[in-house]
From Swiss-Prot:
The gene is VII. It comes from Enterobacteria phage I2-2. Belongs to the inovirus G7P protein family. It is found in: Virion; Host membrane. It is a single-pass membrane protein. The chain crosses the membrane at residues 8-28. The keyword Membrane applies. The keyword Cell membrane does not apply. May initiate with G9P the virion concomitant assembly-budding process, by interacting with the packaging signal of the viral genome. The assembly-budding takes place at the host inner membrane. In turn, G7P and G9P are present at the end of the filamentous virion that emerges first from the bacterial host. This is Tail virion protein G7P.
Length: 29
């Protein structure tokens, strides 16, 4: 894998994790 692709995958993972965390926090509250 190229470094750029790895960075993109990591960035997407962080965005998805953050989004799910925000949604979960919103639902729990």
């Amino acid at each position: 894998m190229s470094d750029e692709l790895i960075h993109v995958v990591i960035a997407l993972g962080l965005v998805i994790s953050f989004g799910l965390g925000a949604i979960t926090a919103g639902v729990l509250r």
